[in-house]
From Swiss-Prot:
Residues 619-734 form the SMC hinge domain. The keyword ATP-binding applies. The gene is smc-4. It is found in: Nucleus; Chromosome. It comes from Caenorhabditis elegans. ATP binds at G121, P122, N123, G124, S125, G126, K127, S128. Residues 1440-1459, 1510-1523 have a biased composition (Polar residues). Its main location: nucleus. This is Structural maintenance of chromosomes protein 4. Keywords: ATP-binding, Cell cycle, Cell division, Chromosome, Coiled coil, DNA condensation, Meiosis, Mitosis, Nucleotide-binding, Nucleus. It holds the Pfam family SMC_hinge.
Amino acid sequence: MPPKTSAAPPQSDESDSDFDDAPVKKPQKKTTKPVNRHKEGSKDPEEELQRAVNEKFDGSDGEDDDSDLFSLQLPSRPDFLTKPNRADRLMIRNVEVDNFKSYFGKASIGPFHKSFTSIIGPNGSGKSNLIDSLLFVFGFRASKIRSAKVSNLIHKSAGRNPDKCTVTIHFQRIVDIPGHYEVVKDSEFTISRTAFQNNSSSYAIDGRPATKNEVEARLRRVDIDIEHNRFLILQGEVEQIAMMKPVKTTKSETGMVEYLEDIIGTNRLEPFVKLFQRRVNRLTCDLSQQRIARDHARNSKVAMENPVRAAIEFLMKENEATTIHMKLEQRRRQRYLDKIAPKQAELDKMKEEMKSIAETLDTNKNEYKQSEEAQKVMIEERSKLDKNFDSLSKELSDLGTEETRRKEALKRHQANISKAEAEKEKEVKKRSNLEAAPEKAERKIAKCQEEVEQLLEIEKTANEEADKNLDEFEKRSEAPKEEQKKIQETWAQKSNEFNKVRGEARIAREDFEDLKKLANSGTDKLIELKKRLESSEESYAKEKDELDKLKPEFDSWNDKLKQLSTELPTLRNTARQKNQDLAKTRDRLETLRQQNSSCSSSNKVIQALMKEKEAGRIKSFHGRLGDLGVIDPKYEGAICTNFGARLNYLIVGKEEDAKNVINFLVANKLPRQTVQPLDKIKCDKRDLAPNPTNPLPAPRLIDLIDCDPVLKPAFYDMVRSAIVGDSTQEAQRMHRMPACRGVTVCTLEGSMIHPSGSFTGGGKTVKGLILTDKNKMAKQVTPEDKAAERDLAEKLGKLRDEADELKGQEHEMDGQLIEARRKVAEMSNRLSIVTSSVQSAAPAIETLKKTIANQEKEAAKVKVDAKTLEDKQKIVEELEKKRDELGEEAAKVKARQAEIQSKLDGIFKELVQCHRDEAKESLQKRQKLEKDIAKETANISNSGRNIAKCDENISRHDKDIEKMKKKCEELMEKAIDDEEVKSKKETVERFEKQIKKLQTKGEEMTKKQSELSAAETKLEGELKKCSEGIKELKESMLADRLKVEDIEKKLAALKVNRIPRFQFLIESSRPEDLEMQIDDKMPVVDENQSPEEVERQKKHMACVMSDAAYALEFEMRQKVLENTESYENVDGEDRVPVELLSDEKINEISSRDAEEMQMKLKVCEQQVEALKAKVDISSIKAYVDKVKQYNEQVIKLTIATEVHRKHNQELQRIKQMRLEEFHSAFEFIGKHLVAVFKMLTDGGDAKLEYIDKDDPFRQGISFMVRPAKKAWKQIQFLSGGEKTLSSLALIFALHMFRPTPFYVMDEIDAALDYRNVSIIAQYVRQKTENAQFIIISLRNNMFELANRLVGIYKVDGCTRNVAIDPLRVCEMAKQITDSLGQATCTLPDEVTQRFNETMSRQNKEMIAQEKQYPNFPSSNEISKAEKIVNVEGRVRKELIQTTRDVTSRPQSKATTSGDGTERPASRSASRPESRINQMKYPAPRLVERSSSQNVRSPRKARNIEADETTPPSKRSNSASTPKRSPMKPLTPSSKKKEKAIVDDDDDME
């Protein structure tokens, strides 16, 4: 199939299944993973390679991502270029379709021939559905299969609507043998695809479900090129290759170079070329920027040399002043040291006395400590007793609870047993009733049947009696009916007269009323007008008064509305601000209350201990451990679940306070607590550091706790070095790591892995034992906090009152505003109505007055005669009187008629209706009895089933009762042993006695500790007195030492400046002043080089020399940096400390020397102060920084140059590799293209050539074609048939380069003439034995050469097919005719021979019968003329070609490309020459016409056999007319000659 011009649409109307996507490459996301070669043993190396390239590159020109491009490995060449040729090949055996498109049910298309199979059939029969079936299996979208969605592929016809369709392709590998083939063992496989009505589809390989990717991989492994689809050429697509541009102009289309690159496989290198090209472009830009940065750094460095010289001079003078100052301070320090020695002796004596007191105090403390240890043992013993006591108490409580539950369960089961037995009794009674039901039902049925028979008899008798009395009714009703008939006639006559008189009376009444109205019209109208005038005047007066009142009232309300509209927003803003203040104050108060509330611990123990701390009795009490630290809520479960008990410990600073806490708790009978003193916790400070020296793979719990540093040891003693992981799996993984050896690992949900490997966890996660919000940490509520809370509460109350008052004012004003708006709207509306009414009322009153005056005049004119009116009234009264009389007569007749009808109804009811009512009543009773019979019959039939159901229910109840009885027995067995309960109670009482005994012993110990504590207090007083004496001496000595230290600090602060030595600046030895030496290895410019090469080498030499110069300068500048530490900081922050003098030299300085040094110091300081404003000390450091920056830029430039060179070198290597691979394949394809096209066109020529040989991938490839006996043309300028031939030639040439196992083509011969179709058919049959061709064709000279024909036809709207081998049919026909003894031609060679003989004989007969005309040539003359034309045409062509070859050499009509191939001259250059040659060598047509004006041209002669698709019999009949020239036998040579004549005619035109 030709290349696709655009990618498939992302979505279609079909299913969203991935299997319906067209097999086109989709751009993948860009990634930086290296592209490695495919793994060994991969199922499809080419697929793995393409996937790897797609993961790395998406084909876009995006930005460079700075990844290491040299780590990428280039993909290897495609497998088809390297793997050896196989002896076997793939072929399609047949295609099975099931309800696919026009195929209903299962059908097998084929089997196909190994070489050439032709699909034939009439239009619309379903030939192209074969290609659609292949496309369907190969994974194309529905839109590519001439369908909107997948479900449309399912067969649909009259009465047939299957729910799915399936296509299965049978493949096999074969080895060709003469005339047949052998199937390779175990090479057969099938691929199928099924589509469903819901637009989904599925794949299968050998019947096994598979994915679309697996199908594509399997097809690639058998060399089916599903990427380019060259094996598939659809109808009308063969010419698309001709329409391809040399190179694509947009991303969606494909050019000739891309088309060939895809097939050759060099496109695998294109992403690498683009990637390296982007990197080289960026590196080139970076290189230019780096050179600019280097030059800028050098200029900045040179500009700072003069300020550096001045700064060095200043530093030297400053060092001189510092040295003098140092000598004076050293002399003063020595005087203070001489005072300290006597005081030190007295201090040593007092320390000895204090040591004796301290030893006595330690003895006392040891006794106290022993007492505490004994107390601690006692406390632990009591703790164990308390624990056992609580445990036994809980067991006793649990036993009681369990016994109560057992008794309740026993009671519940016994109740259920009673209930189940009652239900069972009900079912037993129901069963006995059901057993007796059939007998009762039978008796009732028999009784009902008897009643039914009686009712049937009554019904029958009543109906017979009714039918019998009908005749009697007819006899008795004859007289009344006659009378009724006469009365009806009378009534009709009276009714007509009444209607006639009524109409006359109505008309007369209307005339009278009209005349009466006319007489009164003038007077009535005048009265009405006067009333209206009076009413209008009265209304006008009222409305005018109302208008005068409304105007001032409206103005008043309007002013009020404006005032309220202005005041209300202001009031609302004030109220809003007040509410905001109220909300802020409320929030502050709530926050303060929460803080104060959280500070007051809810625990009574903590509260009581805090009071003791405030009283000063337990000074170092801190609180509960969990309240003293904060942790992230994420880790709350980890610490609370695993260390929950430790978080409840009470923390004190000293051990003695821990004892005081315990005594306090015991004395006040408070719950027992565990107290931990901080001074007894031993831990390494390094363990408390947030970042341990050996980092662990997860955070430590101790590092996650935020607390006071003083309390950190308490938390560390609890969690140690425990770390926390996210999950149990992660914890197990970390536990196995060497770094976590000996470390406890916790999880977020509360599990723990101990260092020994034991695992605990699985229970409920505990939370709430430690704070998760730092703001909630406990602190003491001070009086100031309480006062602040009261103040805020008072302020909140005031603000609330003010806000309520403002809110009330706002509501009141809002109501006033609404009322004002309503009033203004009402008054405005009323004012406009009244104003309009007043304005319109005055003109209306004037109009009414004028109308009244006119009406008075009109009334005087209208007068009616009173006599006429009286006569009319008499006529109306007479007619109405007559109407009433006739109406009374008609009513009497109608009443008589009703009497007669009533009499008739009575007779009918007496004789007939009574019997019918009786029959109807019997029928209703009978129907009711029949329903009862049916009901009882159903009860009889259902009785067995109901009894079985009752039996089942009884059995179920029995099982339930038995089950519940067993449970009751089990519960009875579980009764608690009273002896065991009694024993446990005795143990509890014993524990209580032991606890009381320990409590008494504890009180005694507490008393002894109080006595020891008093003695300790006395000794501490004496020790304190000695300590104060020592303190006074120390303070005196400290004052002297402080002065010495102060002097020493000043001496230590005295520093001299480092004086840098910039020797090369003083000598002015610059690199730019040195002479540059040119290296002998530099390339020399050759005079034979092109100007571009010379210019390129000049630029290269300039860059090399510039880099060498700066490298030399870099070496010189580096000397400045050799001593960087000696002058790196010369601004006073980190200068060199001054060298101090020895004590001997200090003692040698006399007072006179000191005074002289003071004077000299002042002079130096004045000089330094004078120079300080003129110099910039920071210029020295800045200069050093500039030198460093310059050297860094030089190093960066060197590195950038080397990186650019390496990337550019790799880019050129990949480009060259791509070009060489492409060029070798390109030459192979081009050579075979020329050979194939020359064979197809009988002498034509075609070639693929580079538009730009240096870079064919940029400009592309042009496809040049020279049809036989014509000039060179671009393929897009050819005719349709020539385009088809050119495209097919390229397809066949590509087949030789990259063979495809099979080809499926749809009417590729549609645009070809008879001769070219035959050539294509012969080529397919003879020249391509290594492939299978399946061609759909309607041309007989194509399908007649096929090895096998598959006929497609339709029956009842469904497609069917049949396959035959033409040669086999002919052989069978030959055998049949031979067996019958008939000489009939059946084989193709025999038929051709017989046809040629028949043609020769008919031509001879035509010549013999031909009449001779003096003015017309004979047949022999015409034949001679044709031969002459043929010979002269060939001679003329050869002469023209020779002339072109001679003239093209000096005039350079053809150019030679870089690869040695000759390019044809342009059409404009060759056109004049061809015209000249036509003049030199006249056309053969002129010679032919000169012999006779009436002889047909060769073109017309060819029309004799123009339609060569006509059967031989018809062609022989058409040639039998005497006026046509004799026909020659059909041989290949004669056909070629005729075609040559036609081509000559085309050239002459």
